[in-house]
Amino acid sequence: MNSSLSCALELQHVAHELMYLGMDGEPIYSDTFCRLNKDVFVKSNSLFSSKSSDIEEEANLCLALLMGYNATIYDYGDKEQKKQSVLDRAYNILEQLPASLLKVRLLTYCYGEIYEESLLQDAHFIIDQWDKGALTSEQMETMEELKNIEENQYPFEVLQ
C-alpha cells in the first residue's frame, strides 16, 4: 500500500473515531477531544495536496478529507474552500468509480455537504443491489450514516 493511501485510510479511521467519540457511552475527556481534533486537522491539511491518478486511491483521499474536515472543530479560515476543492475532485471521479462500498461512502459524504438529490439516488441505487442478508458491518454503518444525513440535514436550509 502506498504512502498517500495509507495516510488517507489512517485519516478516515481517526476522523471516524472523532465523529463517534462518546457514542459508545464512554465519557468524553477534553484532552482526548482536543488531541483528536488537532490530529484530524493536521492530518487533513497535510493530505490536502495529495492527489492520485488511481481512481480508487483518489476516492479514498477525497473521502478522508471530507471526513476529516467535517469532524474537526478547527478552521484557519480556509476549511470551506478546501472542502469545495475536495468536492470538485470527487465529482471528477464519481462517474468513473465502480459501484462499491467506497463509492457509496464518497456519495454519502458529498451528499452531506451539498444535499444534491442525484448523489442520494446514486447511493441508494448501489445499496439496493447489496445482498441484504449478507451485509458487512461497514455496509450497515454506511447505510446508517446515509440515513442519518438524510433525516438530519443540518445546517441545510431551503432558501425562498
Name each model-derived stretch.
Residues 2-28, 51-74, 98-114, 140-152:
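Amphipathic alpha-helical repeat scaffolds of TPR domains
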Residues 34-49, 75-94, 118-132, 157-160:
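Alpha-helical repeat scaffolds
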Residues 129-160:
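Acidic, proline/glycine-rich low-complexity IDRs
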